[in-house]
Swiss-Prot record:
GO terms for molecular function: DNA binding; RNA polymerase binding. Belongs to the GreA/GreB family. NCBIfam families: greA, PRK00226.1-2, PRK00226.1-4. It comes from the Bacteria. This is Transcription elongation factor GreA. The keyword Transport does not apply. The lineage of its organism: Bacteria, Pseudomonadati, Chlorobiota, Chlorobiia, Chlorobiales. Residues 43-75 form a coiled coil. It comes from Chlorobaculum tepidum (strain ATCC 49652 / DSM 12025 / NBRC 103806 / TLS) (Chlorobium tepidum). Necessary for efficient RNA polymerase transcription elongation past template-encoded arresting sites. The arresting sites in DNA have the property of trapping a certain fraction of elongating RNA polymerases that pass through, resulting in locked ternary complexes. Cleavage of the nascent transcript by cleavage factors such as GreA or GreB allows the resumption of elongation from the new 3'terminus. GreA releases sequences of 2 to 3 nucleotides. Keywords: Coiled coil, DNA-binding, Transcription, Transcription regulation. It holds the Pfam family GreA_GreB.
Amino acid sequence: MSDRIYLTRDGYNRLKEELHLLMTETRKEVLEKIAEARSHGDLSENAEYDAAREEQSQLEAKIGEIENKLASATILDPKQIKTDRVYILTSVKLRNLDAEDEIIEYTLVSSEEADSDLGKISVRSPVGRSLIGKSVGDKVTISVPKGELHYEILDIFVK
């Protein structure tokens, strides 16, 4: 079994829904493609059949990956999360020390739930790794591909 992954209840349920969809509808569609390609005769020179089999292989790998994630998932209850330091599932309010009027907010989540458009960043990202374990008032320097970012932690809370 792989490393533990930490998910919210919503994140866990989304993975279960995706798995169900892949195992029912998507798998059925792929099997229909294989059957259709098989009906065209000689399989040794049947590109359509080869493509359908490759799609099946990728689908089964994706199903296995999601099953492994679900099997190794720990569901975190936001009510149990402490806010004395930055942990997974905490939200942080940061002041950009290079542009004092810029305040940003992130919620630290697992890689599986990261969505930068929603302000959810992975604890494994450069920003997430730099923030984990820090407290209100701490100043952090975050190395990113474009250089360094400098922030002060203004608040830690759970949404």
